[in-house]
């Protein structure tokens, strides 16, 4: 796993995946990238960031420029920083199989199409990073933290399955399938208000 943007979203994604057995090999912030092909201790890196330090303060890894995180070969590459970080000029550098988008619109449409043509699976931002909205809803309805986390996992898993099945069935990009799902749900919700 490589995480581009080790802030709130990036830290939580890295922690969640590490708990599932994934190995973090790279992470970056605005000060640089830390890379270790043998793995980075996620809890220790989070502690470093929580002390207002940078990922490059992590001992036991190679310190690289911030942009170098794009070049790290990995199974899962998580953009969790800002929009349009991957575009036509750098998309060829990305060597991964799965991209759960943690940031909002981290790829240009052209870059997303190019990755799709290379069989890179992209989970759209508003599906993959919906945890905050789901958590707020759970809190609003009086749910506990453990209930909120369970709901987040269940909802994101179910939405991801539905989007990927629709994309496969209709031979479209996952983002298009996700937009269609969202539009259908909004129309349905609006029909209840009439």
Give each language-model segment a name:
Residues 29-32, 82, 104, 126-128:
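Short, ordered loop/turn segments at secondary-structure junctions
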Residues 1-73:
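Glycine-rich phosphate/diphosphate-binding loop of Rossmann-like nucleotide-binding domains
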Residues 2, 76-78, 100:
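Structural motif
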Residues 64-74, 82-99:
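Rossmann-fold NAD(P) dinucleotide-binding segment
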Residues 60-61, 78-84, 102-106:
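A general structural motif
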Residues 96-194:
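Adenosine-phosphate binding glycine-rich loop
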């Amino acid at each position: 796993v490589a995480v581009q943007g080790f802030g709130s979203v990036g830290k939580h994604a890295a922690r969640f995946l590490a708990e599932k057995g994934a190995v973090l090999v790279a992470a970056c912030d605005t000060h640089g990238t830390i890379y270790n092909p043998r793995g980075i201790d996620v809890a220790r890196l989070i502690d470093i960031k929580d002390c207002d330090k940078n990922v490059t303060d992590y001992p036991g890894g190679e310190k690289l420029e911030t942009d170098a995180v794009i070049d790290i070969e990995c199974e899962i590459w998580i953009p969790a920083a800002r929009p349009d970080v991957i575009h036509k000029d750098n998309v060829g550098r990305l060597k991964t199989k799965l991209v759960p988008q943690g940031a909002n619109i981290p790829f240009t449409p052209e870059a997303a199409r190019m990755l799709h043509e290379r069989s890179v699976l992209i989970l759209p931002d508003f599906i993959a990073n919906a945890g905050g909205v789901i958590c707020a809803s759970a809190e609003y309805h009086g749910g506990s933290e453990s209930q909120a986390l369970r709901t987040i996992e269940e909802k994101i898993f179910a939405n991801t399955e539905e989007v990927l099945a629709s994309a496969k069935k209709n031979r479209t990009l996952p983002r298009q399938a996700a937009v269609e799902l969202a539009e259908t749900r909004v129309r349905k919700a609006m029909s209840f208000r009439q």
